[in-house]
């Protein structure tokens, strides 16, 4: 009888050890797709009816409007830069206030807004580049002016729910293009 109990105990103990040695099942963490984009190649963009030119990435698709407003689309990234032109008619303070108001309307969702002044005295282009960090609707905006005749604003939007971590590679790529656009802006 004791031999049966010992044998049974050993079998139970061995089966317990064999089946309890498995690794714990852990859920897979969420991950995001790694996105690589081609190196940007820039070309000058100019129209006959607008008083400015700029350089733009060859990956972008530019659609113009009669009032010198443009949409610069990145179909692969589901992103669009919206450019708006306004002539300055003794209203520079209002234009500046409106541009700043547009940027700071995102402060509710933004973690941080970095202001980076831009000044090119040779080309008479002055402005501000804004980098909006966090889950805001836009992650980059700018305005540029000569303060007497011309005023251009730009902002980038993604056709996706704003999740800063998941759109970061595309947002960084488009932000660099938008900065290049602002820095190559020339008045006619």
Outline where the language-model segments fall.
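Bacterial signal peptide processing site
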Residues: 22-25
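Post-signal peptide N-terminal segment of mature Sec-exported envelope proteins
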Residues: 29-49
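Signature of long, low-cysteine stretches enriched in small and polar/charged residues
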Residues: 100-155
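Secretory pathway targeting signatures of secreted, lumenal, and periplasmic proteins
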Residues: 48-102
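Surface-exposed amphipathic alpha-helical segments
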Residues: 155-188
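Bacterial N-terminal signal peptides that target proteins for export
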Residues: 1-10
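C-terminal motif of bacterial Sec signal peptides marking the signal peptidase cleavage site
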Residues: 16-20
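Second-shell loop/turn segments in exported
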Residues: 81-89, 141-142, 164-172
